[in-house]
Amino acid sequence: MRHKHGYRKLGRTSSHRKALLKNLAIALIEHNKIETGIYKAKELRSYIEKLTTTARVGDFNAHRHVFAYLQNKEATHKLVTEIAPKYAQRNGGYTRIQRTTFRRGDASTLATIEFV
């Protein structure tokens, strides 16, 4: 039973799920808005909000911590220097999820996730 389980498995192994969230986070940082499945978006929100809170500090250690999760220099630099400073006075809630439509092939719910 999955009572009080802390995260969604998304039908993937742990390494595949970790890679998926990393790639979605990089795409969100690069484009500021992406469309994906609703449950992937909800998991990504948790992942990216923790990174943004860390990046708000803006020092070298924050840069290292974010890079350890993303493994992408450009995305790390953009998050720490451009995106996170905008939320210096905001305590959480850096992203917005909006349900958009249903995917034509399998009728799953799609959503856009974007920085507020």
Curated annotation (Swiss-Prot):
One of its GO terms (cellular component) is cytosolic large ribosomal subunit. The keyword Ribosomal protein applies. PROSITE patterns: RIBOSOMAL_L17. InterPro entries: Ribosomal_bL17 (IPR000456), Ribosomal_bL17_CS (IPR047859), Ribosomal_bL17_sf (IPR036373). One of its GO terms (biological process) is translation. It comes from the Bacteria. Keywords: Ribonucleoprotein, Ribosomal protein. GO terms for molecular function: structural constituent of ribosome. It holds the Pfam family Ribosomal_L17. Part of the 50S ribosomal subunit. Contacts protein L32. PANTHER family: LARGE RIBOSOMAL SUBUNIT PROTEIN BL17M (PTHR14413:SF16), RIBOSOMAL PROTEIN L17 (PTHR14413). Belongs to the bacterial ribosomal protein bL17 family. This is Large ribosomal subunit protein bL17. It comes from Helicobacter pylori (strain G27).
